[in-house]
Structures are given as structure tokens and as C-alpha cells.
């Protein structure tokens, strides 16, 4: 049994317990319902949550992907309903809320859901400028991360990205991890749309790329013409690009040989997590490209993301004149929703000054 299935098997009973009490309180607010019906609903929700993960680990199918999307939307809605209920009960301690007001407050969730779903699927292109003194000539990088190809977003997201990249004036595209989500198997032809991209595409794996098998991800990448940097370096024009593969064994800063730095080139580091920037910068890397955080993906997780990660999203510059860019990613994990963050491709214009 793979990592994703094991995690689902462990979490599903607790998730169902949460859903039972959530549904119970929602129905209490609107008049109540027999607990037997709530139990049936809970079992149904549990099946929708767990069964697609089992089938998708063998072969991805349209019906199981559809159920995964429904489950993801409902997980998001459950969190929103929970906050709604807490708010209603707090206010109700001080004033009596009419039934119509309670109903309106509950209806905010599906209205927000429409916006969140659209936001999660509306791929936008941002542009940022990086000024470097040691840059031989201007060059542009399309930075992507966290595509999360899997049960929530399948081949269409790859086609959409490829089409968008072909409409961007860039020299190179870099994917800083989590090309795959780990919720479905990756088949050899899944990334073939990237073969039609009119620029080199470079990829260094992140944590999710391992969940269903990193070998399948790398094989599909290579078939699609994607350059995989697995603790390897490459030169591209005036750039020396090094990719550090995500390791579950890393404790603190990954070991790097300073000989990887090429003083006559601009040194770019691809590292999925936005960690150790200070150390890598002092070592000589001019630009670090990271993802992983999703910027929190949606409220209220965005607030917690800012607390958990020192560098949650955006472009950062230190006193050495070196940069860290943390993108909020293209895809989504667990739920196909976004609120307060963009599904983005970021064009980084590296300019000499």
C-alpha cells in the first residue's frame, strides 16, 4: 500500500467522526434530523473520501477523479461550515439570531465556494524583475511549482500550462517540485503536452512526487522532454542551475559542495521548500526558486502559512543582493479551492545592472 493510501486509511475514521458532529450541528441549526440519517450521510462521505484513493493508486479514471473533486470541495466546505457554526454560537450567546439570518450565514459557504473553485482554476501570469550585478545578459525564467497532477487536476492542467507557456516570451521554464500530487498513478504519456512547449523545461522533484513512485514521475518527464535535475547541475546560457531533490531524510540544510558554485556564471538553485535561503545565499547562489507553501492556498490557512513559513510567498532580496522567489503554485492539494492566493506562473525577468 502506497503512502497516500496509508495516510487515508489512518485519517478517514477521524475525518468521519468530525463530519458526523459537523452535520449534526448544521442540522440542529435548521431544525434537526434523526441521527440515523446523519450516520448514513457520514458513511457516504467517508466512502467518497477513501475509495477513490484506493482505485486511483491502480489506474486513474474519470469517475474516481470526479469523486475526488467532490470530496475536496466538501472538505473545504466542512471547514467553512465549522467556522460558520462557531461564529453563530458565539453571537447567539449575546443576541437571538432569527432563523433567516442563520440560513443566510450558512448560504455564504456555497456562494464562497463558487468563487474559490473559479479562483483555483484561473491560471494567471505574473511578472517580476530581478536585478543582478553578475548577470552577463538579460534572461527570463518562467517559474512554476506545485502543479499537483493527480486526481484533482489531471491531463488538462498539463495542457493548460503548456498552452500558457507557449504564449509567454521566456527563455526557460523551471518547475520547482510537486509536478505530481501523489493521489493517482503517473503514466508514461501524462506529461506529453510539455513536449510541445517552445522552451526548455527543467524540473526538480518535491515531496509529493515521491508518494506514488518517483521513478514513474521521472520516466514520464523524460519521455516528455523535461530536463530532470536530481541533485545535478546544468548550464543554460549565462546561468548555472542546480536542483536539490527533496529528501525526507534531510535534517536542516542539505549537504552541498561549494564547488557547485561557478563564479563566472549566475547561480540558480531549485529547491522545493523555501528553507536555508540564508545559507545557500552565502554559499554563492544568486537566485533560489521554491514553492511548497501554496501561500496557504485559501483563507484561513493563508494566515497560518504566514506564521509557519518565514518566506511564505513572493520575492525576497537580502543584503547580499541575492534573491528567493516562492511561488504560490499552479495546482492545489486536498481541495481544488483557492482564496487569497493565485494559481500562477511567474515570469522572472533577470536583468543586469
Task: State what each model feature region is.
Residues 63-71, 92-108, 114-145, 150-168, ...:
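N-terminal signal-anchor transmembrane helix
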Residues 131-353:
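Soluble catalytic domains of enzymes that build or remodel membrane lipids, polysaccharides, and related
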Amino acid at each position: 500500500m502506497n503512502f497516500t493510501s496509508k495516510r487515508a486509511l489512518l485519517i478517514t475514521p477521524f475525518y468521519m467522526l468530525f463530519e458526523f458532529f459537523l452535520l449534526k450541528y448544521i442540522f440542529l441549526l435548521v431544525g434537526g434530523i434523526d441521527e440515523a440519517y446523519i450516520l448514513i450521510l457520514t458513511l457516504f462521505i467517508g466512502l467518497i473520501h477513501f475509495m477513490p484513493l484506493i482505485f486511483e493508486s491502480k489506474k486513474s479514471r474519470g469517475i474516481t477523479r470526479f469523486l475526488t473533486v467532490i470530496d475536496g470541495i466538501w472538505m473545504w466546505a466542512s471547514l467553512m461550515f465549522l467556522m460558520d457554526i462557531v461564529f453563530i454560537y458565539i453571537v447567539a450567546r449575546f443576541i437571538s439570531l432569527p432563523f433567516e439570518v442563520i440560513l443566510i450565514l450558512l448560504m455564504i459557504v456555497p456562494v464562497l465556494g463558487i468563487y474559490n473553485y473559479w479562483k483555483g482554476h484561473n491560471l494567471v501570469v505574473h511578472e517580476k524583475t530581478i536585478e543582478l550585478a553578475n548577470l552577463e545578459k538579460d534572461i527570463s525564467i518562467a517559474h512554476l511549482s506545485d502543479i499537483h497532477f493527480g486526481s484533482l487536476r489531471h491531463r488538462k492542467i498539463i495542457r493548460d500550462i503548456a498552452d500558457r507557456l507557449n504564449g509567454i516570451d521566456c527563455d526557460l521554464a523551471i518547475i520547482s517540485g510537486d509536478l505530481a500530487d501523489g493521489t493517482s498513478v503517473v503514466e508514461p504519456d501524462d506529461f506529453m503536452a510539455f513536449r510541445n512547449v517552445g522552451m526548455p523545461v527543467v524540473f526538480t522533484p518535491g515531496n509529493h512526487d515521491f508518494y506514488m513512485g518517483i521513478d514513474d514521475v521521472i520516466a514520464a518527464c523524460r519521455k516528455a522532454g523535461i530536463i530532470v535535475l536530481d541533485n545535478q547541475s546544468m548550464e543554460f546560457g549565462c546561468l548555472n542551475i542546480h536542483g536539490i531533490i527533496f529528501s525526507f531524510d534531510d535534517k536542516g540544510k542539505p549537504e552541498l559542495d561549494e564547488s557547485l558554485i561557478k563564479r563566472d556564471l549566475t547561480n540558480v538553485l531549485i529547491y522545493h521548500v523555501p528553507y536555508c535561503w540564508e545559507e545557500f545565499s552565502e554559499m554563492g547562489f544568486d537566485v533560489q526558486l521554491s514553492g511548497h507553501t501554496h501561500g496557504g492556498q485559501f483563507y484561513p490557512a493563508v494566515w497560518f502559512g504566514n506564521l509557519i513559513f518565514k518566506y511564505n510567498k513572493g520575492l525576497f532580496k537580502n543584503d547580499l543582493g541575492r534573491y528567493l522567489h516562492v511561488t504560490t503554485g499552479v495546482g492545489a492539494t486536498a481541495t481544488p479551492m483557492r482564496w487569497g492566493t493565485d494559481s500562477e506562473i511567474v515570469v522572472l525577468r533577470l536583468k543586469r545592472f
